[in-house]
Amino acid sequence: MPNEIFTINLNAQAIIPEAFILLGIVGTLLVDLAGEKTASKWAPIICYLSIGSSLVSLALQWSNPVENAFLGSFNSDNLAIAFRAIISLSTLISLLISWRYTEQSGSPIGEFAAIVLSATLGAMLLCGSTDLISVFISLETLSVASYLLSGYLKRDPRSSEAALKYLLVGSAAAAVYLYGSSFLYGLSGSTNLATIGLEIINKPSFITSLALVFVLSTVAFKIAAVPFHQWTPDVYEGSPTPVVAFLSVGSKTAGFAFAIRILSTTFSSFDEEWKLLFTILAILSMALGNVVALAQTSMKRMLAYSSIGQAGFVMIGIVSGTQDGLSAAVLYLAAYLFMNLGAFSCVILFSLRTGSDRILDYSGLYQKDPLITLGLSLCLLSLGGLPPMLGFFGKIYLFFAGWANHQYLLVIVGLVTSVISIYYYISVIKMMVVKEPQEASEIVKSYPEINWGIEGLPPLRIALYTCVAVTALGGILSNPLFKLANTAVSETPFLQDIIAIANNIS
């Protein structure tokens, strides 16, 4: 009988997707020990099998979610499944675009793959964590792996600088989270997020408000929201580009998953307070991210500030707190996965062929490399929210949900900053397409012959084609994707509380 109760409460099948990722970590480390030649051959295969198995197991869990696993410290509900699927896909595409880059930089492939999978493991666990301790362990697993990835190019001083900055700021964020968690535990006597929420309903004290601010600071750091964004441009510019691609989607998605869960369970009785703080963060992120991006000369720094602005758009859906708003937030993160990684695929390919990421060096690229020009143009147009791209429909759903919930200021700021973002996205496209041959940059004039047969480039080509195709076919895919996102929200029990509160307020 005791064994039966333990089995029921454990529900270990909830983390089968994470178990496959863990097996992938072990496998890549083992082949790495066998030598670089063996690792180059087998590490990608192990990663594909690991992530593919994880995605299949997530699909099987979709119709039969496992809740209350590991004695209440993990929930594999439909919302967690959706976010974990986005993270797994982002890892798969990030690895596809990284093999050639890693080989060309002379870094060990097996070791790199193991660290990326470790970050993925932490991010996926964070999506379903329902306990302060499991949240911290997941958060640190993701963070430590991210620090290692940022400084992976050991011979590049910019990479080392990026890792050090990321480590210092990330350590401060972790300390702030622990400080806030200690307040919550002291007030409730529990580490379970839902239990804490019940215990602090009748304790709207200064200490509880302080804990909310500390936890929100950690969330803002993970999603790179202003004013907790200072690390983002420098880390993005100095880190290896495939690492930046992963951090811009995987880490951000995990941060939003954590935000939705803790705000709608632990701080459900502080609905007005956290929505006000989130509104301020969203406005600052959309405004500063898109305005400062105008002045950037590096493609990676431009995309860094763009990602700050994109986080602000997602926050519109979360602040609305309605069924449509939360569904739109999930949909936009799924869309962001493809359009952002598609853009990074083009940036990596251009960097591999030229060694540059300066925006001016893209001048006249259409004449030498039409594929990169077309792919990057479509992805940038989608990020800007122009029809008929996937990003347009994602923003439409977010703005409609925000307007229906009377978040007029957020929607107006979102519309204005979207127009600003379109300007700097189209400036890059214009530079690539409109320039005459004699106006092309020196790097484009000496552009190397295109050869897709080089080892590591075929996977990058697959990733590029996939991302661009999904981004361009947004009009066809937006409705089924929104239905999936809507199902993830409607069939997640804990979200009904925050939706009910939002409906009562409206």
UniProtKB/Swiss-Prot annotation:
One of its GO terms (cellular component) is plasma membrane-derived thylakoid membrane. It holds the Pfam family Proton_antipo_M. The chain crosses the membrane at residues 14-34, 42-62, 79-99, 108-128, 132-152, 167-187, 206-226, 240-260, 276-296, 302-322, 330-350, 374-394, 409-429. Keywords: Membrane, NAD, NADP, Plastoquinone, Quinone, Thylakoid, Translocase, Transmembrane, Transmembrane helix, Transport. Its EC number is 7.1.1.-. InterPro entries: NADH-Q_OxRdtase_suN/2, ND/Mrp_TM. It catalyses: a plastoquinone + NADH + (n+1) H(+)(in) = a plastoquinol + NAD(+) + n H(+)(out); a plastoquinone + NADPH + (n+1) H(+)(in) = a plastoquinol + NADP(+) + n H(+)(out). Its main location: membrane. It is found in: Cellular thylakoid membrane. It is a multi-pass membrane protein. GO terms for molecular function: NADH dehydrogenase (ubiquinone) activity; quinone binding. One of its GO terms (biological process) is photosynthesis, light reaction. It comes from the Bacteria. NDH-1 shuttles electrons from an unknown electron donor, via FMN and iron-sulfur (Fe-S) centers, to quinones in the respiratory and/or the photosynthetic chain. The immediate electron acceptor for the enzyme in this species is believed to be plastoquinone. Couples the redox reaction to proton translocation, and thus conserves the redox energy in a proton gradient. Cyanobacterial NDH-1 also plays a role in inorganic carbon-concentration. Belongs to the complex I subunit 2 family. PANTHER family: NADH DEHYDROGENASE. NDH-1 can be composed of about 15 different subunits; different subcomplexes with different compositions have been identified which probably have different functions. HAMAP family: NDH1_NuoN_1. This is NAD(P)H-quinone oxidoreductase subunit 2.
